[in-house]
Amino acid sequence: MQNLSKLALVMALSSPLAAFAVDGTITVDGLVTAQSCTINGVAPSGANNVAVKLPAVSISALKTVGATAGLTPLRIKVGGAGETGCADGKVASIAFEHGPNVTADGYLANKAATSPATNVVVQLFNDDGTGIKIGEAGTNNTKATISGNTATLEHSVGYRATGTVTAGAVSTSVMYSLSYN
């Protein structure tokens, strides 16, 4: 009888383990590459900051939700003449990182410290004018093929209304990463 009780105990304790049986293996492979191209003429260092000054716009230019205004070019040049580490034929692309200034909708929140405008965010745009929503797959599609050891990633940045806009300052930032494939 004791053996039967022990067998029942072992079976009872081992049955939940069957629910956690291994069904397969996920293998992850990747590649970490050396940053081989300069960014706007400066060696990559994590501090390759780019400043974009948006023009002043009237609140009347942003009177409906979703209206955009003040589109301003954002150009990031990778490589340069004679930079053999920035290989011709590779494709440069940029990823805008989902950081503390990114709204749930994928725009850049206004973080102006003094007299901020309200109901306005900053939006990034691809070279074809389509809007980018940071963190949403398929919305950031600008790429540039390196030729002559250089390429330029062309984007634009502008204001976007999220409600009835009030006048004031606009300031924000976003982190970015470049890749070359």
Task: List the model feature ranges, each with a label.
Residues 16-18:
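N-terminal signal peptide c-region/cleavage motif recognized by signal peptidases
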Residues 2-6, 20-181:
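Mature extracellular/passenger domains of Gram-negative fimbrial/pilin and adhesin proteins
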Residues 9-13:
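Hydrophobic helical h-region of N-terminal Sec-dependent signal peptides
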